[in-house]
């Protein structure tokens, strides 16, 4: 992808831009706060009326006093139950909080290089039947402070929808404490062993689909890139892949976590925390960072929601809090690798680092990749989920020439956690991904947007219809990145500063910190972490709360809730809304100030001090030729325009006759499958992966040399038998009423006529032999003629 070169922006202009954005952010925050407070005044009758209190109001007041006193006791008792659950969960070893029963398959703690990971098989619930020959699903949850289980938190979850569709489901879990010396490279190796085991258990099934949630997403991509032959399609949900990306504009401040690495001085704080933990990093730090993103929810809303719905809300609250309070640990080597290579350095996918001596090259992945992100996600904004595609492939042509299929699905407003735990998202987006994954494998190489439309049937039932729209990488990258990614330049300064600070810490402070730290001090520090104290203090272990349980039982026996229409409950809700609005106002101002400080420091001051620092965007621009046809991968395909055989000829013909710019409804793939089965005798026996590779090269040829692509078709069909076979297939397809129902465009008719004329004329020139044996004759190829129906 070509990055437009511009003259460097003067520091004063950058400062002016920072000031403009800050001013706009503050105005938006103020306006949002004013509207919320004004809405409270309009919705509360007592705010607009006044009068002498009546007997009715005094009655309501007494009822409200009884109700609020009872709710207070029940609220405190729920927090006590949360504390008891926390201690029970800790005593049980903090097991995974999967809603489903599971069986251990492989425990990596017993591997030659042990890690605290394991593979479990999800036991289908009663009434759910699973077909062992269907594609298995392997779900990887994020190891980001919490324990595993978010992908299978309830029936309406990723696990639930895959089981409901009849697929075997496996889950990658992990244990609270890491094995001594384990690294992320070791974890990647263990996950490879897990996938091989799944394939061994399902020899008649397609390769397993790998589903990665959040940080489990980049783990899934590392797994697939390090051993591309063992995995099926990859689905990554809310997964940060391009860590410098974000939405910097004059609108709302959506991505505050994007700037925290720079404002905290880089990676050295993670090393310090791990050293204070005696070589172990406490995941509670990560959870705390997550909580501070939304102080209104962390400090008030979730507790008021419990208090206001105390008769119905406790079970849901306690279920979520059991997972929220299950904190897991990492080795220092693991957290340092993550922070230095991913969050701050953003250099894993550039080929600067890898595992077991092998660099991670995402272009090695040959199976389709599905990216699911949300505009409402302020932890993994769409830019972070998508920009890696532009960095790794550079252009639409390279995606096609490499035979890759990438599908993007974008939700409008669900938050980060909602991507994984929302029942609505599970029943719609996740369920449809499972349903159409086989069809995604049949897509021609390219970049696609997945669209899910809701349609109501005559009976009022909601059904989902899926279609795919081919997109251009260059257009999508421009839409998501409003400043052509120039706002990522300050992160290069952050990376340089982080390296300096890390070395300074390792030289000047680390030896002392490590000498003063021991297992006892580390454990005391963990137990006194505010996130743990929040969970543990309110429990039966606290002797000052001995009265709470019996009193709560008495309150439940004599519960007298006040009416929801009570003016005092309305006043309570109004006060709560004002408190929430104030905390949101504080958050917006805090985030705006942090953003301004970040860009002023690393976008203005650092470039002035280090003007010769190389720019990643300039490096990318130099690496990508201005003419897409000159890209090495595309050039290789064009140079082989006269090379190939029957499979290449069919793929080229399909490319030449394909409809351009139209959505691809799911029904079209179902028809392709039917046609492929019926005309199997005229199709080459190719696996879908092999067909995509061939189709991708032919796409590049047809895109850049359409006339030569037609003229050289006879060279791919050197024998009269192959030419006759190809023409027979074309004529039979055109005569099929299911195909002719879709009227050909004038361009298609003209192209078809040229193909007929060229093939009818024939050619005595033999096809040039490729360097390797034709892919259709390889013994290891898995016949899948349906794929040839592209």
What are the language-model segments listed below?
Residues 2-77, 200, 204, 221-333, ...:
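Alpha/beta-hydrolase-fold enzymes
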Residues 91-178:
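Short, surface-exposed "cap/lid" segments of acyl-processing enzymes
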Residues 177-182, 189-208:
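Conserved acidic catalytic loop of the alpha/beta-hydrolase fold
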Residues 211-220:
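Gly/Ala-rich beta-loop-alpha elbow adjacent to hydrolase catalytic centers
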Residues 365, 371-373, 377:
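Short beta-strand/loop motif that positions the catalytic acidic residue
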Residues 379-384:
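Conserved alpha/beta-hydrolase "acid-adjacent" motif
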Residues 401-477:
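C-terminal catalytic histidine-bearing segment of alpha/beta-hydrolase fold enzymes
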Residues 616-790:
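Small-residue-enriched hydrophobic alpha-helices in membranes
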């Amino acid at each position: 992808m070509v990055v437009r070169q511009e003259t460097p922006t003067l520091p004063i202009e950058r400062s002016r831009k920072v000031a403009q954005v800050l001013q706009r952010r503050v105005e938006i925050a103020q306006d949002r706060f004013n509207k919320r407070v004004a809405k409270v005044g309009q919705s509360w009758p007592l705010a607009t009326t006044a009068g002498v209190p009546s007997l009715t109001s005094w009655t309501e007041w007494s009822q409200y006093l009884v109700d609020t006193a009872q709710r207070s006791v029940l609220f405190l008792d729920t927090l006590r139950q949360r504390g008891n659950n926390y201690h029970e969960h800790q005593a049980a070893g903090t097991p995974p909080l999967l809603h489903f029963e599971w069986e251990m398959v492989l425990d990596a703690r017993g591997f030659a290089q042990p890690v605290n990971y394991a593979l479990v098989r999800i036991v289908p619930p009663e009434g759910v039947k699973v077909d062992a020959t269907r594609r298995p699903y392997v779900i990887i949850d994020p190891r980001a402070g919490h324990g595993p289980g978010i992908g299978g938190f309830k029936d309406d979850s990723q696990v639930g929808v895959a089981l409901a569709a009849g697929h075997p489901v496996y889950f990658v879990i992990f244990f609270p404490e890491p094995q001594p010396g384990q690294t992320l490279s070791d974890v990647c190796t263990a996950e490879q062993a897990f996938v091989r085991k799944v394939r061994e258990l399902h020899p008649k099934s397609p390769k397993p689909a790998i589903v990665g949630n959040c940080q489990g997403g980049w783990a899934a991509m590392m797994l697939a890139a390090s051993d591309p032959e063992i995995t099926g399609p990859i689905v990554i949900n809310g997964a940060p892949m391009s860590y410098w990306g974000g939405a910097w504009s004059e609108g709302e401040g959506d991505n505050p976590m994007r700037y925290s690495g720079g404002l905290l001085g880089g990676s050295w704080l993670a090393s310090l925390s791990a050293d204070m933990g005696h070589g172990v990093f406490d995941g509670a730090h990560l959870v705390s960072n997550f909580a501070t993103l939304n102080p209104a929810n962390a400090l008030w809303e979730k507790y008021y929601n419990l208090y206001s719905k105390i008769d119905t809300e406790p079970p849901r609250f306690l279920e979520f809090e059991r997972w929220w309070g299950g904190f897991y640990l990492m080795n220092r080597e693991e957290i340092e690798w993550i922070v230095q290579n991913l969050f701050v350095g953003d250099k894993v996918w550039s080929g600067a680092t890898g595992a077991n001596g092998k660099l991670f090259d995402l272009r090695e992945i040959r199976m389709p990749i599905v990216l699911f992100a949300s505009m409402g996600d302020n932890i993994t904004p769409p830019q972070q989920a998508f920009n890696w595609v532009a960095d790794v492939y550079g252009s639409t042509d390279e995606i096609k020439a490499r035979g890759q299929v990438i599908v993007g699905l974008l939700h409008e407003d669900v938050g980060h956690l909602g991507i994984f735990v929302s029942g609505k998202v599970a029943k719609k987006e996740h369920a449809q991904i499972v349903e159409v994954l086989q069809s995604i494998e049949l897509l021609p190489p390219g970049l696609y947007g997945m669209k899910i439309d809701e349609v109501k049937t005559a009976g009022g039932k909601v059904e989902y219809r899926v279609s795919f729209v081919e997109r251009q990488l260059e257009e999508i990258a421009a839409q998501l990145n409003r400043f052509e990614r120039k706002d990522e330049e300050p992160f290069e300064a952050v990376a340089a500063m982080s390296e300096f600070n890390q070395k300074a810490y390792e030289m000047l402070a680390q030896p002392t910190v490590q000498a003063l730290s021991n297992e006892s001090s580390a454990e005391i520090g963990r137990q006194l972490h505010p996130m743990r104290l929040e969970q543990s203090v309110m429990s039966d272990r606290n002797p000052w709360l001995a009265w709470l349980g019996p009193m709560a039982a008495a309150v439940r026996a004599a519960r007298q809730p006040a009416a929801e229409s009570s003016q005092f409950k309305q006043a309570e809700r109004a006060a709560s809304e004002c408190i929430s609005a104030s905390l949101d106002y504080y958050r917006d101002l805090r985030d705006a100030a942090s953003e301004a400080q970040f860009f002023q420091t690393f976008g203005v001051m650092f470039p002035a001090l280090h003007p010769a620092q190389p720019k990643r965007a300039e490096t990318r621009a130099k690496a990508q030729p201005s003419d897409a046809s000159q890209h090495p991968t595309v050039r290789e395909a064009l140079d082989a325009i006269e090379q190939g055989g029957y499979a290449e000829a069919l793929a080229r013909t399909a490319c030449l006759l394909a409809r351009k710019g139209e959505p691809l409804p799911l029904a079209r793939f179902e028809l392709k499958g039917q046609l492929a089965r019926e005309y199997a005798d005229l199709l080459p026996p190719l696996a879908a992966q092999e067909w995509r590779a061939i189709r991708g090269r032919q796409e590049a040829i047809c895109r850049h040399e359409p006339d030569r692509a037609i003229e050289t078709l006879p060279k791919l069909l050197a024998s009269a038998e192959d030419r006759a076979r190809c023409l027979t297939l074309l004529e039979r397809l055109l005569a099929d009423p299911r195909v002719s129902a879709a009227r050909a465009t004038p361009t298609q008719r003209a192209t078809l006529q040229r193909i007929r004329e060229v093939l009818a004329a024939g050619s005595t020139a033999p096809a040039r032999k490729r360097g390797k044996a034709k892919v259709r004759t390889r013994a290891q190829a898995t016949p899948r003629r349906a794929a040839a129906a592209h």
